[in-house]
Amino acid sequence: MSTHHVFVYGSLKKGQPNHHELLNSNNGQAEFITCAQTKEPYPLVIATKHNIPFLLNVPGSGKQVSGEIYSVDQKMLEFLDWFEKCPDWYQRTSIQLEILKGNGESGRIEEASVYSKINFEPDWLNKPTHESYDTNGDHGLKFVCREDRKDD
């Protein structure tokens, strides 16, 4: 069985509103591997009226972003592509990550796929950037789940 490593930094992380999608075996299989951060800084911004976290594909700008690496099967990868509206909304690209903890491997560099934005509103680059995302964070911008959105 072919597996893929995927880095999640927003609503799919443990404790966040969409994490249940990774746990739902109807979507495929996902196994938590470890915590990591981007090797390079990237802008992690919260945008749109739904307060969605976006990793903007602008390496060298912003901050090193922390998140989680999951090993997913092909079915889950296809689900995540659908869920993230890839390639129209997010684009799945490769990213270099630094392992933060786990089995004495801190500091090791790993490559994984990430859902990031290549095309975005120019003013998003002026938004505050974050090292880590939490819907209940100090930013005060609570994520609006799809089922609670009035216009989607």
From Swiss-Prot:
It comes from the Eukaryota. Keywords: Lyase. The keyword Zinc does not apply. One of its GO terms (biological process) is modified amino acid catabolic process. Substrate binds at residues 9-12. It is an enzyme of class 4 (lyase). The active site is at residue 84. Pfam families: GGACT. Its EC number is 4.3.2.8. One of its GO terms (cellular component) is cytosol. One of its GO terms (molecular function) is gamma-glutamylaminecyclotransferase activity. It catalyses: epsilon-(gamma-L-glutamyl)-L-lysine = 5-oxo-L-proline + L-lysine. InterPro entries: AIG2-like_dom (IPR009288), GGACT (IPR039126), GGCT-like (IPR013024), GGCT-like_sf (IPR036568). Belongs to the gamma-glutamylcyclotransferase family. May contribute to degradation of proteins cross-linked by transglutaminases by degrading the cross-link between a lysine and a glutamic acid residue. Catalyzes the formation of 5-oxo-L-proline from L-gamma-glutamyl-L-epsilon-lysine. This is Gamma-glutamylaminecyclotransferase C.
